[in-house]
Amino acid sequence: MSSKYIEVPSNAMLLERDMDKTPVLETMHLGIDFGGLTAVDEFNLTIGRTEIVGLIGPNGAGKTTVFNLLTKVYQPTRGTILLNGKETSGMNTVQVNKAGIARTFQNIRLFSALTVEDNVKIGLHNSMNAGMFSGILRLPRHWKNERVAHERALELLSIFEMEDLANHQAGSLPYGAQRRLEIVRALATNPSLLLLDEPAAGMNPSETAELMENIRKIRDTFQIAVMLIEHDMNLVMGICEGIAVLNYGKIIAKGTPEEIQNNPQVIEAYLGKQKEDGQ
């Protein structure tokens, strides 16, 4: 992979992050009810600074609801969320994104008529300091920020070897490339925790293997944590250091991939069901 644009964090930055032992995410007794239905209950999870954690479970178990709680699409009925040691109660989706959580979605949500680079620049918006009037009046600060955004967008695209596609229309990209672009755009917000909702959906085995390599590269290069929802068990077991299994809105098991694979409750509730279905 070309390293022309890759920006590796400084040794001082990496040392600072390494010295900070505060978990990137802690949830305590997190839950939400919709009417009289409990969708998620007693969701307790801790994610370390550079951990890759998987959240698995049958369809309808509440996995995406958990992501919606973490990103404040939904406000929890009960419980506490600590992001980098600080409570997120009262925050909205924009505020929690600025505080350090970025995500992708099950369904691609790109601006298909814009270029690849412009999609990444939209993700960079929160970290840019240019005001509205500097943009309208085309002040020097505006042009400086445009230059910085262009360079940063290419740096991020190079992680997935997509810098040569910068001027292509996002909607013209193959499906797998569009999913990678979503991850790049999420990274552009400079998160400390990246949430990936079924990142391998629609990918062939070769693309999935490349995705695994790139997720590790993202974690190692930017020293961030990654939490993913995924039905591809080869990906989950191959990349995650910790796994939580959700069933009917509750965590039924937490542990290493090996521990999860050998957990009777998990085999019955999820992995075993897949075997019965011949998957």
Residues covered by each model-derived region:
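Glycine-rich phosphate-binding loops of nucleotide-dependent enzymes
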Residues: 2-279
